[in-house]
Amino acid sequence: MIEQIFFGQFQSPGPVMFQIGGFALRWYGFLIASAVIIGLNLCQWLGQKRGINPDLFNDLVIWLVVAAIPSARLYYVAFEWPRYAQHWLNIFAIWQGGIAIHGALIGGTIAILVFSRYHQLSFWNLLDVLTPAVILGQAIGRWGNFFNSEAFGAPTNLPWKLYIPFANRPLNLTSYAYFHPTFLYESVWNLGIFAILIALFFYGLRNPEKIKTGTITCVYLIGYSLGRVWIEGLRLDSLMLGPLRIAQVVSITLVLLGTAGIVWLYLLQKNLPDWSERKLVKN
């Protein structure tokens, strides 16, 4: 794959991983399922280090799948309603692509809030454990865009250019064959943020009095959103509200919220809980 990227042969083999009779396993679904499984195992490992029963994540992952995937789809459909108004059954064809991470974050956050209260867990400590798995899952899931030949950027002739089949090109750009692989940019960016969050997590384990509860969540919001603001500007298929790219507006808002959170934790409210408080579950 690396050789293909840098020798101009970078293109999707198609959306279907394999097919047996009438059953087709699509790469998009396989990658989402893989991200969920890998994320679950990572959460159990990190959660145990923070004093959370790993078995709780077996329940939480069901809550998240039930909440995040439908909300990601509905968020996308809401801003693309003209495409679905006359073919509303296509709303359920999620295997064809068309989900929005910000929608998933909204649904997932609500699910985590309800779950944490139901199980008497610290909401912010739970988020600090979950966010490294979330960003890793995003890095994996972005490759679904590659196999679907979607979510690419403007035409380019860079060595790592991505070939897009004629049928998937925008109508006004059919004469161009190669485009920015924005999915790849975001996947690599997310892996970098994942490395930062993991490093911060283990720094917190070694120096618990120096890490405030909620820090990792705030760093995630800032790190991921900064990359999304940049990458979204390259894409040709952004969800729009008038002249505004929705993902950029939301991402800028999340950067501001994450920055405000860091300021609040470390400058305005220095007596807030840090990681030295090990009682994460109320008995």
Curated annotation (Swiss-Prot):
It comes from the Bacteria. It is found in: Cell inner membrane. GO terms for biological process: lipoprotein biosynthetic process. A 1,2-diacyl-sn-glycero-3-phospho-(1'-sn-glycerol) binds at residue 142. InterPro entries: Lgt. Keywords: Cell inner membrane, Cell membrane, Membrane, Transferase, Transmembrane, Transmembrane helix. Its EC number is 2.5.1.145. It is a multi-pass membrane protein. One of its GO terms (molecular function) is phosphatidylglycerol-prolipoprotein diacylglyceryl transferase activity. Belongs to the Lgt family. Catalyzes the transfer of the diacylglyceryl group from phosphatidylglycerol to the sulfhydryl group of the N-terminal cysteine of a prolipoprotein, the first step in the formation of mature lipoproteins. This is Phosphatidylglycerol--prolipoprotein diacylglyceryl transferase.
